[in-house]
C-alpha cells in the first residue's frame, strides 16, 4: 500500500543546492582553529588546503582577493585561526569552507580577546572624548613609565635632551612584557599619581609582535590609565601598532620619540621668543622717546607764542612733571625689562646656550647705554631751548623797553595815553619810568599839526 502523502523526491542537483543553502543560511560565518595540510596555490592565486585536528578534517578554499591580506605564508602543519563561511561545492557534493581571513592561532586568539575588550570598554565610555584631559603647556616635569633597559626610554630621553634639556624627567621603571608586566605598569601609574611629581606621563614601549605588546591590551592597565589624574600620553610600539592603552590615554603618540616631541618645548623656539621680545622692547623704547620728543616740541612752540612769565613758569613746571613721568616710566620699563631678562637668562643658563646669552646681554648693555646717552642729549637740548626762550621773552618785555629811555603815561582812569585829545588841562597824569613813577598836572595841551604832502 502506498502512503497517503508521497515523500519529496530530490534530484542530486536540487539536494546539493538545498544542503548548500541550509549550510550558508543557518551557520553563517564561524571561527575555526586547526592545522594546515595539503596546502596548494595554483596559477589562479587562490589557496586550497585542508584544516584538521586529531579526529577530523575539512577542505578549505581562500580566494585571491582574501588571501592577499594575509601577512604570512601558510605552512604545512601550522596552527591557524580562520574566519570562514560554510558551504557545499554542488558539482561534486563536497562540503567545504570559504576562508575570509587567517591568522596564526596564537595571534588570532589574542586578536579576539583584543576586540572583545575594546568593545567592552568602549561601551562603558572609557574611550569618550569628554574624559580626555588636556596636556600641560608647557610641561614642568615629565614622568616616563617603561622598561629602564629598553630602546623606548633611550629614544624619549634623547629627544627631551635635544629639545628641552632643562625639563625634569622622572623614570618609573617597570616590565613591559610578560605575565608580571600589567601589574607593574598599573603600580607605576598609581605611584606616579600618589607622588604627584609630574604633570604629564608617557606610558609605552618599543615595537614588537602582538604578544610582545599584549601588556598594553590588559584591562587593568586600561583602567589605571583612565583613572589617572595626571594626563597620560600612550607611546606603544610603532605607528601601525594600536593597543587598548592608545584608546584610553588622553593622547596617543605613534612612537616613544613622538611622545617626547609632544610633551616638550623646542629650545630654538624659546630663543626666537627672546629675540622677538628684545625687538619689541627696542621698538617700544623708540616709539616712547619719539612720542615724548614730539610732545615737548609742541609745548615749546606754545611757550614761544605766549609771553607772560607766569605762564612760562607753569609750562616749565609741566615740562618738569613730564620729564619726571618719562623718567619714571623709562625706569619702570627698564626694570621690567631687566626682570624679564633675568628670568630668561636663568632659563637659558639651565639650557646652557652660553654664547647666545652672552651676545644677548652685550646687546642689552649697548641698548641701555644708548638709551642713557639719548636721555642725556634730550635733557641737555631741552635746557638749552628753555634758556633761549627765556632770553627771547625778556628781550621783548615792556620793562626792557623802559630801560632804553621810554616811558608809559596813564590817565586817572588807568588808560594808557596815546593821543593828546585823551586829556584836558588840569587833569593829573601818572608816568612810569624804569625806576619809578611821576605824577604831574596838565598845564597846557599843544597838538602837533600833521604836514600835508602835495600831490603833483
Curated annotation (Swiss-Prot):
This is Exodeoxyribonuclease 7 large subunit. It holds the Pfam family tRNA_anti_2. The lineage of its organism: Bacteria, Pseudomonadati, Pseudomonadota, Gammaproteobacteria, Enterobacterales. The gene is xseA. It catalyses: Exonucleolytic cleavage in either 5'- to 3'- or 3'- to 5'-direction to yield nucleoside 5'-phosphates. Belongs to the XseA family. It comes from Escherichia coli (strain SE11). PANTHER family: EXODEOXYRIBONUCLEASE 7 LARGE SUBUNIT. NCBIfam families: xseA (TIGR00237). One of its GO terms (biological process) is DNA catabolic process. It is an enzyme of class 3 (hydrolase). Transmembrane segments: none annotated. Keywords: Cytoplasm, Exonuclease, Hydrolase, Nuclease. Heterooligomer composed of large and small subunits. CDD domains: ExoVII_LU_OBF. Its main location: cytoplasm. GO terms for cellular component: cytoplasm; exodeoxyribonuclease VII complex. One of its GO terms (molecular function) is nucleic acid binding.
